[in-house]
Amino acid sequence: MATLVGSASIKGSTETVRMVLLTFATIGITFTWGIEMTYCTPYLLNLGLTKSNTSLIWIAGPLSGLVVQPIAGVIADENTSKWGRRRPLMVASAVIVAASLLVLGFTREIVALVVADGESATRPTIFLAVVAIYVVDFAINVVMSCSRSLIVDTLPLEMQQTGAAWASRMSSIGHMIGYAAGSIDLLQILGTTLGDSQFQQLTVIAAIAILGSTAVTCWAVTEKVLVMPKGAEQSKSIVQVLRQILSTVRHLPPRVRAICWAQFWSWIGWFAFLFYNTTWLGETYFRYDAPPEARQSKDALGDMGRIGSASLFVYSCITFAGAFVLPLLVRSPDEGGFTQRPPRAIAGFVKKLNEKKPDLLTTWICGHLLFAAAMSLAPFARSFRFATFLVCLCGLPWTIAMWAPSALLGVEVNRLSGGGEGGSAYRRLSDEPGIELPEVGVGASDATVYLEDPMAGTDAEVASTAELSGIYFGILNIYTTLPQFCGTFIATIVFSLLEPGKSPELSGDGSADKGTETSGPNAIAVCLFIGAMSTVVAAFATHKLRAGSGKGAFRILG
């Protein structure tokens, strides 16, 4: 039986500082994702890759999330490094991400060192760029998985919502920085110091961001150390790892399973929104609001991207504000056992205010319903302003979607680990009310955490295994990535039925005047509507989670 020894702690004199340091890696993760999602498609097209093949490349995202995060979670859960279970993998993966970003940005220059002829270098350049994208996707999923698990491992049950909220805040900051960096002419400001193009300079900045943000979190956090008994098997084969993942999926605790199913149905809706919102906004503009001269644009695709990005900046501002304000207005899942004592003068007011706060489940349900209401109106959008309004309405639901599942799963994992009532004692790190971490010391028999091997026990033991946050968050990510494959399948059918050819808004030759059909429903809007209906199912599944174990939700849904 393995044991966790030592003390988990976070540097910093105040709760705010500690939470920022704990979640700081999220800024680099989000910034890197944003640069990849925004700039890699035109970059691949510029290298000579066809659009159909480019779309296949982006299977890397959900594929890496489906495969890498659960495996990384299992490996990290059993890591016996003296530096802890999560941080060594975070650092190694961040280095791989940074190196791959540099390869991606300077692909032409690297290939030119080996292949001199321009035409002969095209295929090797494309191949190297595609490999770099896959490596970035796979490695950054490891950083993401370990950073989430680090929050769960380090914070007690009462602080799980706070930790998830701060991760959402750092994520929104990463998005804001990404939008700002992408909108600035870096060549004019920095010259050619970091590269000869905007994309090259952004990849260098992203590499610095992922390394720097990961280093800050790893420096600030001290983990418990996993100690294996003498003679115990130190590592598992890939087959054993996959068996453990499958076994854990089959024997998930009921409430964890309910959270996963709610996530599954909601992400069918979020996939269409996240991947197609910019294009939908641009197409709506060209279909209903663009003046005749705009329809004749030689760069309709570029114009569409800029128009969509301008609206998404407003959306990102709403997300940014919501990430800071909403957690203050929502009651923690375990707030009853962790209350700060306000001054007597305002104690009555604070008590009444806390009684009026909605809980996290209610907030998540409201987020589902608001998103569903907004996107169900997408097929009826007949103006760019109305489409922008609908997208902006999804800002707060997105904030909740990034925060609620992680917080709720963190609470459940902590309860499985004995972090709730009857669990280990806590020690305060400072005089400020806030973060209290488990007091787990070497030789303290009442505080040492023992880990059972999930492959060596009964079903009940598998369901209640402690300190397996890595594999649980990896499984949650499976329920996040599978809907992306479903969304791709749905979009393929809708596009083939409604817009089997080229998008009429992208014809670039005045499509409305040439008789190209634009009066029918927009195919992307139909995908958004289907996603809205799926999110209604997610709201129902989340409501079932409130009723108890949540078994009813997946008895009829999966």
Regions found by a protein language model. Name each.
Residues E78-A99, I110-L113, L328-H368, G420-E421, ...:
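Cytoplasmic membrane-interface "Motif A"-like loop-to-helix N-cap segments
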Residues G73-E78, G105, V111, G174-S197, ...:
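Transmembrane alpha-helix termini and helix-breaking/packing motifs in multi-pass membrane transporters
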